[in-house]
UniProtKB/Swiss-Prot annotation:
An annotated GO cellular component: cytoplasm
Protein name: Chaperonin GroEL
NCBIfam families: GroEL, PRK00013.1, PRK12849.1, PRK12850.1, PRK12851.1
Major enzyme class: isomerase
Subunit structure: Forms a cylinder of 14 subunits composed of two heptameric rings stacked back-to-back. Interacts with the co-chaperonin GroES.
Example of a GO MF term: unfolded protein binding
Gene (name only): groEL
Keyword field contains Chaperone: yes
Chemical reaction(s) catalysed: ATP + H2O + a folded polypeptide = ADP + phosphate + an unfolded polypeptide
Length: 547
C-alpha cells in the first residue's frame, strides 16, 4: 500500500480552503449577464471558451493534493446541481465558497463545527421554504421564453426557440440540442417517440462517431416474447433483404443464437438490422408495444391473438422515416401510423389517467401519453466557428434545463434576489446554542454572495446593491445587471427557476458542511524520485520505482 500524507485540524482545513478558493474564483467570474468568459486549453484542437460554471469546474485539477481535495469537493457541488437542475452551477459554487469561508473562520475562532453545521442546516431549510413560498407557476409562453433567455445569458433568440419547442412537444416531449452545419441556429420539430432502451449489441452501430445506430426508412418488427432463434423468421427476413430496407426488431429480448446471427448478418452487410428490448415490464410492456404498433402502423406479433413468428409477412411490419438508437435510448421518428388511430389511442390513455387512483400508474400513463402525443424537437445551434458553436451549445443546454426546471417548480425573481430576500426570513432565528446561531448567521451572510458577485461582474459595488434591495419590501424588486437599473425583476423578465435556486443552495450547504466539519485530510504521498524522462529509462514507466 502506498504511503500517505496526513494533515490535521486547521492545517488540513486551510489547505483545502485554498483549493476551494482557486476553483470558486475561476468559476464565479462567469456569473450573471455581464459575467466574463473562461478560456480552457484542450489537449487537441482549438481552446474552448465558455461561460458555463460546471464546464470550468470540471477542467480544474490542482497540483497540490490537499488543495485539490477542497477543489474537488466544490466541483461536486457544481456537478450535482447540474445533474439535478441542469443550471445554477455557478450560483451553487459561489454559495458553497461563502459558507466554507465564513464557517472556517468560526471554527478557527473556537466554535464547535458540528453545532455550526446544525445551524447551517436549520437556516437552509427555512430559506428553501421561503423560496418555495415565493415561487410562482409558469403559465405563459412568454415566461418560458424569459427563463430561457436569462439562462442563455440574455440571448433572446435561444429563449424564444426553447419556448416554441416546449409549446410544440410539451414539457414531457423530447428536446435535443445538436451542432448545426450552418451559421444559423434553427428549430426542427419532428413527431416521434423515444423510449429508454438502447441497442442490444454495439456491433449494430452505424455511426461510430456518435456511437449510434441510424436506420433510414426501416421496417419494424414487434414481438412480445423472447427471440432465441431466427429459424421461424427466415421467410420474412429474406423478404426484408429483397426490399432493400433496414430492419429494427423490438422484442422482450433477443438472445443467444438469434442475436449472434443478426450481428453476423449485419457485419457481412447482408442485412442492415438492429435489435432493442421492448420498453417497460409485464402488462405495461404489452401496452407500450401496442403504442409503438399504432404509431408505426405495425401488428404486434403475439401468440395471444394467434399470430406466430413463422406467419409474419411484410405487411405486419411497421414503418418509420428514421430510427436513432444510442446505448440508452431509441427514437422513432415519423411513424406511418394512421392519425385517427393515434388520436384514438391518445384519448384512451387520457381516460385511463382520469380513472386511475394510483399515482405511480398515473405517472407511467402520462409518460406514455407524452411519447405518443409529444414529439422530438431538435435545436440546431449554429455559429461562425467551432469554438463559438460549442460555447453557444453550452448555453442552450443550460437554458433548456432551466426552462424544464421552471415548468416543474415555478419561477422566482432572478439575479440572486430570491436568495437575498430569503435571508430576511432568517432575521431573528436562533439555534439551540450560540454556535448554532452563528451557523444561521453564516447562511444569512452567504445568501448575499451571488447577488454581490453578479453586481461586481457588472462593475457595480455589491454592498450598495444588497443594501438597496433589502430596504425595499417588494419581493420582485431587484437589480437588473444587464441594464444596471433597480426594477421589478418579474416585469423585466429577469427570472430564475425555483428548482435551480433551491438545488444550488441545498447542494452548496451540504458540501460546505462536510468541509467545515473536516478534522483530518489524507492523500497519497508523492513518489520518491522524479521518474525517468519520457521515452527513456526503464520500460513501462518503471523509472520512478525506488529500487
Amino acid at each position: 500500500m502506498a504511503a500517505k500524507d496526513v494533515y490535521f485540524s486547521s492545517d488540513a482545513r486551510d489547505k483545502m480552503l485554498r483549493g476551494v478558493n482557486i476553483l470558486a474564483n475561476a468559476v464565479k467570474v462567469t456569473l450573471g449577464p455581464k459575467g466574463r468568459n473562461v478560456v480552457i486549453e484542450k489537449s487537441f484542437g482549438a481552446p474552448r471558451t465558455t461561460k458555463d460554471g460546471v464546464s470550468v469546474a470540471k477542467e480544474i485539477e490542482l497540483a497540490d493534493k490537499f488543495e485539490n481535495l477542497g477543489a474537488q469537493m466544490i466541483r461536486e457541488v457544481a456537478s450535482k446541481t447540474n445533474d439535478k437542475a441542469g443550471d445554477g452551477t455557478t450560483t451553487a459554487t459561489v454559495l458553497a465558497q461563502a459558507i466554507v469561508q465564513e464557517g472556517l473562520k468560526s471554527v478557527a475562532a473556537g466554535m464547535n463545527p458540528m453545532d455550526l453545521k446544525r445551524g447551517i442546516d436549520k437556516a437552509v431549510a427555512i430559506a428553501i421554504e421561503d423560496i418555495k413560498t415565493s415561487s410562482k407557476k409558469v403559465t405563459t409562453n412568454a415566461e418560458i421564453a424569459q427563463v430561457g433567455t436569462i439562462s442563455a445569458n440574455g440571448d433572446k433568440e435561444v429563449g424564444e426557440m426553447i419556448a416554441k419547442a416546449m409549446d410544440k412537444v410539451g414539457n414531457e416531449g423530447v428536446i435535443t440540442v445538436e451542432e448545426a452545419k450552418t451559421a444559423e441556429t434553427e428549430l426542427d420539430v419532428v413527431e416521434g417517440m423515444q423510449f429508454d432502451r438502447g441497442y442490444l449489441s454495439p456491433y449494430f452501430i452505424t455511426n461510430a462517431d456518435k456511437m449510434e445506430v441510424q436506420l433510414e426508412e426501416p421496417l419494424i418488427l414487434l414481438f412480445e416474447k423472447k427471440l432465441s432463434s431466427l429459424q421461424p423468421l427466415l421467410p420474412v427476413l429474406e423478404a426484408v433483404v429483397q426490399s432493400g430496407r433496414p430492419l429494427l426488431i423490438i422484442a422482450e429480448d433477443v438472445e443467444g443464437e438469434a442475436l449472434a446471427t443478426l450481428v453476423v448478418n449485419k457485419l457481412r452487410g447482408g442485412l442492415r438490422v438492429a435489435a432493442v428490448k421492448a420498453p417497460g415490464f409485464g402488462d405495461r410492456r404489452k401496452a407500450m408495444l401496442e403504442d409503438i404498433a399504432i404509431l408505426t402502423g405495425a401488428q404486434v406479433v403475439s401468440e395471444d391473438i394467434g399470430i406466430k413468428l413463422e406467419n409474419v409477412s411484410l405487411e405486419m411490419l411497421g414503418r418509420a422515416k428514421k430510427v436513432s438508437i444510442t446505448k440508452d435510448d431509441t427514437t422513432i421518428v415519423d411513424g406511418v401510423g394512421e392519425k385517427a388511430d393515434i388520436e384514438a389511442r391518445i384519448a384512451q390513455i387520457k381516460r385511463q389517467i382520469e380513472d386511475t387512483t394510483s399515482d405511480y400508474d398515473k405517472e407511467k400513463l402520462q409518460e406514455r401519453l407524452a411519447k405518443l402525443a409529444g414529439g422530438v424537437a431538435v435545436i440546431r445551434v449554429g455559429g461562425s466557428t467551432e469554438v463559438e458553436v460549442k460555447e453557444k451549445k453550452d448555453r442552450v443546454d443550460d437554458a433548456l434545463n432551466a426552462t424544464r426546471a421552471a415548468a416543474d417548480e415555478g419561477i422566482v425573481p432572478g439575479g440572486g434576489t430570491a436568495l437575498l430576500k430569503a435571508s430576511k426570513a432568517l432575521a431573528g432565528v436562533v439555534g439551540d446554542n450560540d454556535d448554532q446561531t452563528a451557523g444561521i448567521a453564516i447562511v444569512r451572510r452567504a445568501l448575499q454572495a451571488p447577488i454581490r458577485q453578479i453586481a461586481e461582474n457588472a462593475g457595480v459595488e455589491g454592498s450598495i446593491v444588497v443594501g438597496k434591495i433589502l430596504e425595499n419590501d417588494n419581493s420582485a424588486f431587484g437589480f437588473n445587471a444587464q441594464t444596471e437599473q433597480y426594477v421589478d425583476l418579474v416585469v423585466d423578465g429577469v427570472i430564475d427557476p425555483a428548482k435551480v435556486v433551491r438545488t444550488a443552495l441545498q447542494n452548496a450547504a451540504s458540501v460546505a458542511g462536510l468541509l467545515i466539519t473536516t478534522e483530518a485530510a489524507i492523500v497519497e504521498a508523492p513518489k520518491k524520485g522524479g521518474g525517468a524522462p519520457a521515452g527513456g529509462g526503464m520500460p513501462g514507466g518503471m523509472g520512478d520505482m525506488d529500487f
